[in-house]
C-alpha cells in the first residue's frame, strides 16, 4: 500500500468565506447579468438563509421556494449521483473495493459484524410496512423519496421508539429502513423528504457498508479484510477483527466476484487504510446532505434539519453546513434541478 487517497472537497478552506453574504450577493449579481434565473434564485436562497436577502432577493425566494413537495418531472440519474452529487467527494479505490465485494455479500458479512457488536435491532413483523402500498405519510414520503433518488426502499419498520428517530438498520443481506412512530406527526412533507433522502443515500450499494461499519475505524477493518482476501496484503498483517471479517469474505466472495476483488485490491493505492476509510465516510456524509437538499428543494429547511438531526461521524456540523451552502450555488445542483424539471426559468 502506497500513497493516501485524495481528500474530498468538503467545505472550502475558509469556513468564514462560506458564511460571507458578500460572496452570494456577488454571485447573485453575476448570475443576473448572465440571465441564469435558477442560479440567481439559488444564490438568493443562500442570502435568505443567512438573513441577508434584500427585498428583490426575498421576493425571488418566496415566489419560487416550494411550500410542499417539489413538482418534479424526473429522477436522479447515474451521472447525477456519480458526477454531480459526488463532485469533490470521490474515493475511487475504496469504492472499487466495496463494489467488488458486492451488495448481498457485503450485507451478509456486515450483518455478522453487526451481530458481534450487538447492534442487531429486533424488528417485529407487525411493525413492517410496504412503502409502495401503505397509505401512511411516513411510508408515502419514503416511497416518493425512493423513486426520486432511484434508491430502492422495499420495506419500512415503524417502531414505538428508535434512537435518532430514523435510520438504516443492519439487515441480513441489506440495510433495513426503520423509524420512530413519533416521526409521523409534527413534520411537514418536505422535512420528511429531506430526512428520508439523506438516509437513503447511505443505502446505495457501496455506501451501505456504513450501515454495518458505521465509523472510519470499523470501515477500515473491512477494507483491510478486502485487501487481504484480494491478495494485496498478508493476512498476518491485518488486525484481529479484520481477520474475522476476512473469514466471512472468503466464504461469500467467489468466482468472478473474487477476481474483481483481486483486481481492485491490486489497484488500491492507499498507504493508510484508515485515511481511505475516513475519506470515504466523509464523502458519503456530504453527498447524503446534498442529495437530501436536491430532493426537498429548500435550503433553509435543510440547514435547520441538519442542525436538529445531525448525521455524521467523520464530518463536523460546521462542515456539513458549509457544504450545503456551497453546493446550493454550484453548477452541479443547477444541472440536477434541470434533470428533475424544477429549475427556475
Ranges and model annotations:
Residues 8, 17-174, 182-190, 205-206, ...:
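Hydrophobic or amphipathic, alpha-helical segments that drive membrane association/targeting
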Residues 246-249:
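Small-residue-rich helix-loop
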Residues 176-180, 200:
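Short hydrophobic beta-strand segments that form the core of ligand-binding sensory/regulatory domains
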Residues 191-199:
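Short alpha-helical catalytic segment bearing the HExxH-like zincin motif
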Residues 2-11:
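Acidic, proline-/serine-/threonine-rich low-complexity intrinsically disordered repeat tracts
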